[in-house]
Amino acid sequence: MAVRRVVTGHTPDGEAVIASDSEVASILIGDRGSSTTLLWGRDDPGRFPDDGSQPSISAAFPPPGGCMAAVMELAPEGDDFHEFVRDGLAPWADPDDAGMHRTATLDYDVVLEGVVGLELDDGVEVTLGPGDVVVQSGTRHRWHNRGDSIARVLAVTVGAFHDIEGGRPV
């Protein structure tokens, strides 16, 4: 999916300007049509005014104090859906439970299009539709798309500290 990203910034005198206006490319995940489009992110809390340049990003999820925004496109599930999700999330995924993962982030997930399921540790799944919002507090979870078309979710993640690793306190 093509996404137009408009970024604001400041001149050296502090005046607000459009720093960039361009399309952002998607990164395909597997061969079934799922993708991620990184909209913006940074490893630090930021300081303004700035010129609107893209800050550095060191990982797929931000460290404490960092943030990231992305659009996830989830293809309808098939037999291999969670296997390729697991492979794409390898450092954060549960190797024994395909698709389950946990990150040290506070996530704000907004369903833009389609119907998705959010499953937590207890196996209970909540069904979400366009306009629904999930506040994900570093919990172990997996996403489902049980429909027959692509589902789109805007995910804004804020890096946090987490005292649980792999389901066990650290």
Question: Which sequence ranges carry the predicted segments?
Answer:
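N-terminal leader/capping segments at the start of a protein or of a new domain
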Residues: 1-52
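Conserved short histidine dyad/triad with adjacent acidic residue
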Residues: 23, 55, 68-103, 137-140
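A short acidic/small-residue loop/turn micro-motif
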Residues: 24-26, 124-126, 142
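Compact, glycine-rich, soluble single-domain proteins
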Residues: 54-61
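Short, conserved beta-strand element in jelly-roll/cupin
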Residues: 73-75, 101-118, 159
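A short hydrophobic beta-strand segment most commonly corresponding to one strand
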Residues: 107, 133-142, 148-165
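Short acidic-glycine-tyrosine-enriched beta hairpin
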Residues: 120-138
